[in-house]
């Protein structure tokens, strides 16, 4: 047996269905395209996935809601529980010390929130602080200084 003598079994290869070649062929007349419409025509008949046939599309029917203020201040927030965990009694807490311990990311002003308890004295110098956090720090004997923003 040689390579040129190999051939597939009798039933293994089916002839390709030739479309549009007479009514008796099973794929004659409309050639599987149905009747009329963009997809039955010749040429490029791809339709954009969001096109709904001329009906106002969904993304235009859904109402527009709200807006984003360009003046909104976004803070790097940190809770008292994290300060209690990462700093010792009498430590000064500033943006730089928080960055050094990887508790905040660079570029945003820092705000301290009041979740957690404080047992150590901290000297806190940050851009903003919640009233509950300020009360807890001062009750523990610490001090709070709010820094003024450069642009204000």
UniProtKB/Swiss-Prot annotation:
Give the matching InterPro entries. Ribosomal_uL15, Ribosomal_uL15/eL18, Ribosomal_uL15/eL18_sf, Ribosomal_uL15_bac-type, Ribosomal_uL15_CS
What are the TM regions of this chain, as residue ranges?
A: none
Q: What spans are recorded as compositionally biased (Basic and acidic residues)?
A: 1-14
Bias type Gly residues, positions = 21-35
Q: Give me the ranges of the annotated region Disordered.
A: 1-55
A GO cellular component annotation in the UniProt record: cytosolic large ribosomal subunit
Record-level GO BP terms: translation
Keywords (alphabetical) are: Ribonucleoprotein, Ribosomal protein, RNA-binding, rRNA-binding
Outline the subunit composition.
Part of the 50S ribosomal subunit.
The record's comment on protein family reads: Belongs to the universal ribosomal protein uL15 family.
Record-given protein name: Large ribosomal subunit protein uL15
List the taxonomic lineage.
Bacteria, Pseudomonadati, Aquificota, Aquificia, Aquificales
**Gene name of the encoded protein:** rplO
């Amino acid at each position: 047996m040689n390579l040129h003598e190999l051939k597939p079994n009798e039933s293994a290869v089916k002839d390709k269905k030739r479309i549009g070649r007479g009514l008796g062929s099973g794929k004659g007349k409309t050639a599987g395209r149905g009747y009329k419409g963009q997809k039955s025509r010749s040429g490029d008949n791809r339709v954009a996935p969001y096109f709904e046939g001329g009906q106002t599309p969904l993304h235009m029917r859904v109402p527009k809601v709200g807006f984003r203020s360009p003046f909104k201040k976004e803070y790097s927030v940190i809770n008292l529980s994290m300060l209690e965990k990462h700093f010792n009694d009498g430590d000064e807490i500033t943006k730089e010390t928080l960055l050094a311990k990887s508790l905040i990311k660079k570029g945003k002003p820092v705000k301290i929130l009041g979740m957690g308890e404080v047992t150590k004295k901290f000297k806190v110098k940050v851009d903003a602080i919640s009233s509950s956090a300020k009360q807890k720090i001062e009750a523990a004997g610490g001090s709070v200084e709010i820094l003024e923003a450069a642009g204000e």
